[in-house]
Design a protein with these regions (language model features):
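General marker for long, soluble alpha-helical cores
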Residues: 1-180
Length: 180
């Protein structure tokens, strides 16, 4: 299925007996967050953007829904609200390779180390809020992604008994951060 975002949004706003499973190509570069969200909700198939560089801006919930699934976006993304969570940011980070800007950098994040790694491995603005790692199965790679200059907030490990093994430089980087 291929067409401009407005036409595809109209198609997917209709009620179908079954969810569309085929690929969808958005052929124009004038799509917006609302249209991308509607198209993504209407298909389980891969979404291909002819213009992957369109900037998107909106609240984290809408951005996560627009960028969920298989999509090839690489434009800038701005999260405008201060109510985002780890799940939403992980979906956004998984859906774009573009720069992610947090308008409110102070929001506390709490979640699984692998989701936090997904977020902080992306090109994201420096986060200044507290970060809590909630699982007890984190590793050096995950902690390094969280601690490697992407956040200046205090990092809390809910389980601080996990044994860590790794390169001395990586461990030094991790432990140079502020832990609660």
């Amino acid at each position: 299925l291929s067409g401009d975002a407005t036409d595809l949004t109209t198609i997917f706003s209709e009620t179908f007996a079954a969810t569309h499973n085929g690929g969808v190509t958005i052929t124009d570069g004038a799509y917006n967050l609302s249209e991308l969200k509607s198209v993504n909700a209407g298909t389980r198939g891969e979404i291909t953007l002819s213009d992957r560089t369109v900037a998107l801006s909106g609240d984290a919930t809408d951005l996560a829904l627009a960028l969920a699934g298989t999509i090839n976006h690489n434009g800038a993304v701005t999260v405008t609200d201060g109510a985002y969570n780890v799940s939403e940011l992980a979906a956004i980070a998984g859906g774009t390779s573009g720069a992610i800007t947090l308008n409110d950098k102070t929001v506390a994040l709490s979640g699984d180390a692998s989701d936090l790694k997904t977020i902080f491995d992306e090109n994201i603005t420096k986060h200044t809020g507290a970060v809590t790692v909630t699982d007890g199965s984190y590793n050096v790679s995950e902690l390094l992604s969280i601690a490697n200059g992407k956040t200046s907030g205090t990092i809390t490990l809910d389980d601080n008994t996990v044994a860590l093994s790794g390169d001395a430089t990586d461990l030094t980087t991790i432990f140079s951060e502020t832990f609660a």
